[in-house]
């Protein structure tokens, strides 16, 4: 099997994932998976598509991810891995689709407006 390449996005983060048959080694930006995503929550998010389709130890994953913060990057990797799992197995799409792992989350940061402190917050109003 040749390496499968997919892209996932979330907020400003973009993840490029290369998956090939192997023993379950995951590297993110040339670092170990547990080093790059130290918290259990982020690790769970990244591994979710592979664990749901029971493919954690069947494939080696190489990830290039940039932009955004740690949560956005983890969810971008999750999106890309879910797309790869759909291509690898026929029945995987039926498993991942109801969980919402194949749907791009459209929520982005709302821009700051002039005449206001932040996107929604106004400057203090003085009646007199």
Swiss-Prot record:
A GO molecular-function annotation: structural constituent of ribosome
InterPro entries in the record: Ribosomal_Su5_D2-typ_SF, Ribosomal_uS9, Ribosomal_uS9_bac/plastid, Ribsml_uS5_D2-typ_fold_subgr
A biological process from GO: translation
GO CC term, one of those recorded: cytosolic small ribosomal subunit
Pfam families attached to this UniProt entry: Ribosomal_S9 (PF00380)
Keyword flag Transcription: no
Domain of life: Bacteria
Keywords, sorted A to Z: Ribonucleoprotein, Ribosomal protein
NCBIfam families: PRK00132.1 (NF001099)
Entry's family note: Belongs to the universal ribosomal protein uS9 family.
Name of this chain's protein: Small ribosomal subunit protein uS9
Gene behind the chain: rpsI
